[in-house]
């Protein structure tokens, strides 16, 4: 039975137009692949693409919340167009191991597809974008290369927070949105609810909403005809001067830095001399091509196409995503919307036990070549030695980077607690008329409030606008959580009779301290979260320092709101005590703000039995030995140093 079942399933994927037999627990679907297109490669593929006019180009992406089936749907579309073999590697466009393990998309990927519709060839460019808020800048750049998007909604979960956020981002860029309800094969699928939410939340008509199952392939063949008929083609012009948008970049051992670009206008080919509008640097184009699904070299890239360019760049610092490439001596205007990505979370990275500094530096540089959004500067800690201060787009971004460091390079590191960029506003001095604003991303640089109190006008912390969707029965617990994290309610709307959309303004510092985990606990896993930057707000900030025998352990210092300091101080000293070894003198652990001690724990000294070999009747010798031991302990208490092992830092930081 099972052998026959597997054979019938394989047959359904291989096509062309083979239907799976009707079985009691299988949906019936067909996957039609044009064998002529599936067999194309090399010069034949390039000639076929060259014959397609720009009017028959369609560039589109998929808008969805995390885990709503975006990568699986991409697989089905690639199989449908013959780009990849049916039943092959899952989540094909998720290239990184960490993406497949976590089931998320981290790096935007693109793939070119050929599709025959009503007897004519169409050139389709699919951009698979991340769904998580940490990668919002990458999503925005990817949308800029598209004319429309599939608005994907999970039938079992309905509209979620990141669905809403990504919808409004796509809507603001004037993308045509096609609603698609996925996972309709699940027993818990609630299609009417999803329909109602699409209509009420996004004000989109539900007459032509596609209902599909990306997992089984059910109705997936209806998607591309709808894309062709409803999403407009690019409006670029071949005869206009070259303008190409840099969407992403990665490093290749042979070509150097490779750019993923969207050619807005004009034509670019090997030998074309281009200039970066942002940096002013000039380059000769070494190679151009498309992703089908891997790199396929072509003679040229034309207006409306998404492909790669190799310019001979040696460092990723030369490639600025969102920048415009134009021909040398051209007067073409740059494409709008360029903005450098700004890190929002900073951590200290130091070599772990047995890790060589030079080897770790090489590993970090290799990873940052493929991730332009990561910033890296050298830093020194008295406790941990030489290391780096690194900036990330968010806590997930930092966590993914750490996983890649371990998986791809076997590098074990110590990562300090995340910090956000605070601002110190100083009063004008002398002839100055405006306050001086200093941004601080390292707690070690936080000013001494006792010494500089007169100079400081205010301390400010970054804020975020949070959007949460949750079942109505959890409103009370989630609102209590937001208020406990210094949140301010902005809005509350009902998506339908059971789902609520909450909007709060919350300090970013509270968000990076496992707010998402607490939100899941408060809603029993049913809530979803999205956020975006929302300026700065004046706040009562302090730096909490950890001291061991009077010496500040700089790697553990954190900036926080004054209301959190006492509770955090007590937790810190109790936890850190469990990671330190005993000594022959008292080890005093303190948490303090300035000179004010908020909490203290003591690891009592262990005594050596100096009387072990002494005769019981020798009282004078006994007294002398005890006196000498006491004097020695007093000297150790004064001059002795506590060497904190790196395992203690790793253990403590992993639990804070």
From Swiss-Prot:
Its EC number is 3.6.5.-. Keywords: GTP-binding, Hydrolase, Membrane, Mitochondrion, Mitochondrion inner membrane, Nucleotide-binding, Protein biosynthesis, Transit peptide. CDD domains: EF4_II, EF4_III, LepA, lepA_C. InterPro entries: EF-4, EFG_III/V, EFG_V-like, EFTu-like_2, G_TR_CS, LepA_C_sf, LepA_CTD, LepA_IV. GO terms for biological process: positive regulation of translation; translation. It is found in: Mitochondrion inner membrane. It comes from the Eukaryota. Disulfide bonds: none annotated. GTP binds at residues 64-71, 128-132, 182-185. GO terms for cellular component: mitochondrial inner membrane; mitochondrial matrix; mitochondrion. Residues 55-235 form the tr-type G domain. It is a peripheral membrane protein. Gene3D superfamilies: 3.30.70.240, Elongation factor 4, C-terminal domain (3.30.70.2570), Elongation Factor G (Translational Gtpase), domain 3 (3.30.70.870), P-loop containing nucleotide triphosphate hydrolases (3.40.50.300), Translation factors (2.40.30.10). GO terms for molecular function: GTP binding; GTPase activity; mitochondrial ribosome binding. It catalyses: GTP + H2O = GDP + phosphate + H(+). The keyword Nucleotide-binding applies. It is an enzyme of class 3 (hydrolase). Residues 1-28 form a transit peptide. Its main location: mitochondrion. Belongs to the TRAFAC class translation factor GTPase superfamily. Classic translation factor GTPase family. LepA subfamily. HAMAP family: LepA. Promotes mitochondrial protein synthesis. May act as a fidelity factor of the translation reaction, by catalyzing a one-codon backward translocation of tRNAs on improperly translocated ribosomes. Binds to mitochondrial ribosomes in a GTP-dependent manner. This is Translation factor GUF1, mitochondrial. It comes from Yarrowia lipolytica (strain CLIB 122 / E 150) (Yeast). The lineage of its organism: Eukaryota, Fungi, Dikarya, Ascomycota, Saccharomycotina.
